[in-house]
Amino acid sequence: MNVLEQQLNHLVDECRPYTAQGKVADYIPELAHVKNDLLGVAICLPDGTYIHAGDVHHKFTIQSVSKALTLCYVLMEFGEDYVFSKVGMEPTGDAFNSIAKLEETVPSKPLNPMINAGALAVTSMILGETAELKIYQFRQFLATLLNRSVEEVTYDEKVARSEYETTDLNRALLYFMRHHGIVEGDVDEIIDVYTKQCAIEIDCFDLARIGRVFAGNGEDPDTGEELIPRRVVRIVKAIMTTCGMYDASGEFAVRVGLPGKSGVSGAILAVGNHELDLNNVGFGIFGPALDSKGNSIAGMKLLELLIERYTSR
């Protein structure tokens, strides 16, 4: 264990008590069973190797972190003009599942792709004759980012079913958007794809590698091959910076200052930048105890302290 990894272990120990101040996402029944005090962090370095601490081998579902990745996928498939004709790019102070801004905005398109309405609109763009084919296309894209076979990128069927059966508000968002011409197709099929997308299983190393791809402007850290076009990376990082942490995005930008995306499983993906001594790196964090805004309470603190101690200025 090197000095940096020792420091990372101390940081996890320092932040783990914060888990007692949060609670797991019990409104999704299958997520309610996760231990509250888990906390782990992996950092993918410029050469593709990792340092890590805590509960990094614990598997969890990607949840809303997938919103940044489906946005990448549809931008690569259809281009920004089409995608942003259906969804905006402005932050909102409302909760991630709010319908309020849809009713107030003309035309009635979601304000950004990181809230549920926007993410559902993005998922509805994925092509395929069936829901399984659509989720396969997304799994294939994710497999490319992770340097794995598509068969190794799986979703938790129990979590997907649990979310599918308790997602009336998302259905309402879709019906509203379909009425206004923002989305097309069968609502239940879109929900099926969306819940399976959110139920894909990953760990801290996977998140950190994806963050490293973003930090390297879309290049594979092992081969240098372009996995995501630089322009798409820039767009998605900008939207993660302004909208990625639900209605705590502004606070996260001030306290941490990195592009990031969280999920209600306790996942946080963050992208290193030039202000860090740890430049050109990706961060993957897992801490299922959430704060009132749906972000990992200990994970947010861990990132804040990590950045505070490793900034170059």
Curated annotation (Swiss-Prot):
Its EC number is 3.5.1.2. It comes from the Bacteria. Substrate binds at residues 64, 116, 163, 170, 194, 246, 264. One of its GO terms (biological process) is glutamine catabolic process. InterPro entries: Beta-lactam/transpept-like, Glutaminase. GO terms for molecular function: glutaminase activity. It is an enzyme of class 3 (hydrolase). Keywords: Hydrolase. It catalyses: L-glutamine + H2O = L-glutamate + NH4(+). It holds the Pfam family Glutaminase. Gene3D superfamilies: DD-peptidase/beta-lactamase superfamily (3.40.710.10). Belongs to the glutaminase family. Homotetramer. This is Glutaminase. It comes from Exiguobacterium sp. (strain ATCC BAA-1283 / AT1b). The gene is glsA.
